[in-house]
C-alpha cells in the first residue's frame, strides 16, 4: 500500500484536554462486563472494545467506590420524595446494533425516567439512545418490562427521548417527573436516583456546587458542547447515565450525564432547559428545530477574557447587566467552510447576538433554535477590536447523519458534526462507520474518510453510492482515504470489492415513528468481469551460488485469504502468506492452515507480484497444518516452476538452504543446518478451541531468519524441497491477548501421498486415529511397563531418537468405540501393522488404513489390538446457522480434541457485538441442548425450533458450558437487525456455499431485505461480516 496510515494513538486537531477538573470524563452507562472479562479470549463477531470511551468499566467502578460520600438517614421529607420518584425511574437495557458515527456496536444498561406518563416518554442521555440503530427495553421499579424506542436524540446535547406504551404497565401507577430547570441552584441538596453501578436502584446524595462549568470532554467518542453543565459530588458510576437529579420537592432539576474516573466524587449534570423544550415540542406535535453556526463556544472567566481583548468598557456593561456572572462565551473552534468560517475566529469574545447582551449558553440556544435558515448578527471582540458579523443559522439536523449505506461488507455515512467538531474539519465527506469486508483498512477500525474510489472523487454519500453501483463484483479498485487524526496523509490502497458474499447494497434510514431503521436495496451487484490471461516475469535471487536454489523464486506465490464469516473459533478474518507451487500445470499450491483455515473464504493468488487470480480450496489436512489450493493456470503467462518435493526424510545436522518470506513479504535466504526434528506439541487455546497441528514432526534450523519468516522452504543444493516452512497457530497469550504463532518446518515426504492423489484427480479420503500422541523417553517407557526387549528394538529401529509415543488425549468421536478396542489415555504404542513407531512420521500409516494391528502397553500390560481408524472427511464444518447475532455449527475438530463429552451438535462459535446474543450473555464455546424445552441435538432440530419463535418475543435456551455447567438463558429475538440465516456448503454455488434466510415467517433463498452489516460478522480483529453468498 502506498502511503502510511495514521497511528492508533488518540489525538485530535484540538489542543490536548487538560488534566484538570474540566478534562474529559467517562459517561455513566454500564457495558455488559459479565460477557467479556479481561481474560476472555473467545471470539466475538466484531473488534474488542475495552469498555466504553477508553475506560475499563470494572476498574472505573472500583476506583469510584471509595469516593462515595457517607450520608446520614434521610429526613421524612426526602423519604416521601424518593418514594414518589422511584416509580418513574427505569432501568434501560439496550443494544446499539451496529457502529454508527461516534458509537461502536455495544450492549449496555443505563437509567431513564418518565417525563410524560400519558404519551409514554422517557428522558435519558443521548449517548444511551445513540445516533444509530437502537434496540432496547425498560424495567420499572416493580420489574414490569416494556419495549422502548427512540423518538428524539439531540444532535449535540446529551439527552434523548424514548417512547414506550403506557398501557403495557399494568401493576403500578406511573407518574411523570416534572422538569424544573429553574430550581437548580448552587448549594441545594439533591439525590441521584438510578441504576448506579448496574444495580437495580441506587440513591446517591450530593450538593450542587457549580452551575457554570463547561461540558465535560469524553475523548474521541460522543461529547456534548455549546452548553454549560452543573457540578456536584454524588459519586455516581457506570449505569447511572440518564438518572434524574431531583430536589427535596421531587422535581427533576438536572440530568445525570458523566463524572470523573480518577476516584474523585465529582459528577456532571446536564441542565434541563433544552430537554424541556424538546419534550414540549413532542407533546404539541411540533418539529424540534435546532440551529447552529458551526462554531463551538466555551465559558471563560473575565480574567481570561481580558487577556483575549475584553475592554474595561464592555466588562463594566456586562457586569452591570449580569451582576452574578463571572464568565463570558468565547469562540473555541470554528469549522472550515461552515457558516462562521472567515467571520468568527478562535478567541473571539461574544458580546451581543441580535443586539442583545449575552453570556449564557441557554439564551444562545434559544436564539439559534428559533432562527434556522435566518441570519443572526454577532458582536465580537477580537483583540480589543469590535467585529460585527452576520451569520446564517444552519439546521443542525441536516449535518447529523440519519442514514447509512452498507456495501461490500462496510458501512458509510456522511461525516457528522460531532466528528467534524472534534477534529476541527469541514463537515463534509464520506465517513467509514464500519470498516469491514472489502473496506477493512490497516491499523485502525474507524475514523476513515473516503476520498476516491476507482479514480472517481466521492465528496458526499450520494456520489459514493453512484460510484459503488458501477463497480463489478470481484473488481480490484484503487481507493484513497485519509484518517481524521491525520488529514495531511493521503493513503492509497487497492481493494478487492466483494459483492457476492454480501450482494445487496442496503440503505438504512432512521424512522422516528417506529424507532427502527428501514432498509432498502439500492442496487444488485454487477457480475464479475471475465479474467484475461496476463504475462509476468519473476525476480531473480541474487548472491546465491546454487542456480537450482535461485530458481525456486518461481515456485512461490502470494496467497491472501478473506473469511466473511467466523467459523471454527478462528480468530481472524483475513490472513496472508506465501504458498509453494507444487504443480504449475494444474495450479496447485500448498500453504499453511494458519493462512487458509477453512473453505468459506475468498482466496486470491498473486504470481510474480503481478498477476492476480482467484483460488479455491482443494484439500485441508486435518492434523498436519497444510492446505492445498488451486488457481487457473490458463490465466497465467509466467514461467512458474513446480517445486520438486523430496521423498527422503531430512535428518538432524544436515546442511540445507533456507528460503523464506519475512513479515513484510520480502524474500530472505541463508545456508543453514537442521538443529532438531521433534514431535511438536502446539499448545491448545484454553478459551476457544481452534485448529492446531497435532501428531506432526517439526523441524528447526540454525538461522535467525527462521523466526522472522512465516512462509518458506528448506531446499537441497539441487533445488529439491526438503521441508516446508509454515506458520502454526497456537494459543492466545493471556498477558498480551495476542495469538501466538510458531514458525516450524514440515518434511515433504509426508505430503507426497496426498499430492499424488490430487494430481491424479482423486479426492484424498484420509483415515486417522482419534488420539493425540506425545513422545516419551525410554526411562519413562520403562516405568509405563515397556519391556527391555521392546526398548532394545527401539534403540535399533531409530538410532537418532530413542523414543516411543504415549496417548495424551482422546478426540471425542460421535460413534465411540468400545474402550477395549480403542486407544486410551496413557497407552504406549509400540507398533502399528508390524512397524515400530519411533517417530511421528511412522504414524502416517494410519491415513491409508481402515484398521491397524497395534501392539501397545496399557497399565504395564502388553496388548495386541485391532484399532479402527475414523474418516477424516467429516471433521470440517459444512453447515452453520446465524441466529440472534451468534454463529452456531456442529462442534469442529478442535472442540472434539479438547472435550471429553459432546452435549449436543449445536455449538456457539462466535457472536456479534450489539446483538441479542451479546446482550443476554450467550458466549462462544457453549452448547445448546434445548430451545423452549424442546431437545435440539443437532442443527436441523435447532433451526426448526428457532424459526418458530415470533419476532420480538422471549424464548428459553438451555445451554451447557464447555466445562459441563448447565444453565438457562432467556433471550428476545430480533429479526429486523439480526435475521436467522443458514449457510450450507454447496459445490454447485459460485462461491461454494448457499445461504437461506428466515425472516418475517418467510424462507428466502439468499440474502433477506433486513439485517445490519456484522450480523454474523467480522471481529475487529472481530470485526466480522457474515453476509454470505446469495
Swiss-Prot record:
<protein>
    <recommendedName>
        <fullName>Pro-apoptotic serine protease NMA111</fullName>
        <ecNumber>3.4.21.-</ecNumber>
    </recommendedName>
</protein>
<dbReference type="GO" id="GO:0006915">
    <property type="term" value="P:apoptotic process"/>
</dbReference>
<feature type="active site" description="Charge relay system">
    <location>
        <position position="158"/>
    </location>
</feature>
<keyword id="KW-0378">Hydrolase</keyword>
<feature type="compositionally biased region" description="Basic and acidic residues">
    <location>
        <begin position="15"/>
        <end position="24"/>
    </location>
</feature>
<dbReference type="InterPro" id="IPR009003">
    <property type="entry name" value="Peptidase_S1_PA"/>
</dbReference>
<dbReference type="GO" id="GO:0006508">
    <property type="term" value="P:proteolysis"/>
</dbReference>
<feature type="active site" description="Charge relay system">
    <location>
        <position position="240"/>
    </location>
</feature>
<dbReference type="GO" id="GO:0004252">
    <property type="term" value="F:serine-type endopeptidase activity"/>
</dbReference>
<dbReference type="InterPro" id="IPR001940">
    <property type="entry name" value="Peptidase_S1C"/>
</dbReference>
<keyword id="KW-0645">Protease</keyword>
<feature type="region of interest" description="Disordered">
    <location>
        <begin position="1"/>
        <end position="48"/>
    </location>
</feature>
<keyword id="KW-0720">Serine protease</keyword>
<comment type="similarity">
    <text>Belongs to the peptidase S1C family.</text>
</comment>
<keyword id="KW-0539">Nucleus</keyword>
<dbReference type="InterPro" id="IPR025926">
    <property type="entry name" value="PDZ-like_dom"/>
</dbReference>
<feature type="domain" description="PDZ 1">
    <location>
        <begin position="312"/>
        <end position="384"/>
    </location>
</feature>
<keyword id="KW-0677">Repeat</keyword>
<dbReference type="GO" id="GO:0005634">
    <property type="term" value="C:nucleus"/>
</dbReference>
<feature type="region of interest" description="Serine protease">
    <location>
        <begin position="89"/>
        <end position="279"/>
    </location>
</feature>
<comment type="function">
    <text>Nuclear serine protease which mediates apoptosis.</text>
</comment>
<dbReference type="Pfam" id="PF13365">
    <property type="entry name" value="Trypsin_2"/>
</dbReference>
<feature type="domain" description="PDZ 2">
    <location>
        <begin position="880"/>
        <end position="960"/>
    </location>
</feature>
<dbReference type="InterPro" id="IPR036034">
    <property type="entry name" value="PDZ_sf"/>
</dbReference>
<keyword id="KW-0053">Apoptosis</keyword>
<feature type="active site" description="Charge relay system">
    <location>
        <position position="127"/>
    </location>
</feature>
<dbReference type="Pfam" id="PF12812">
    <property type="entry name" value="PDZ_1"/>
</dbReference>
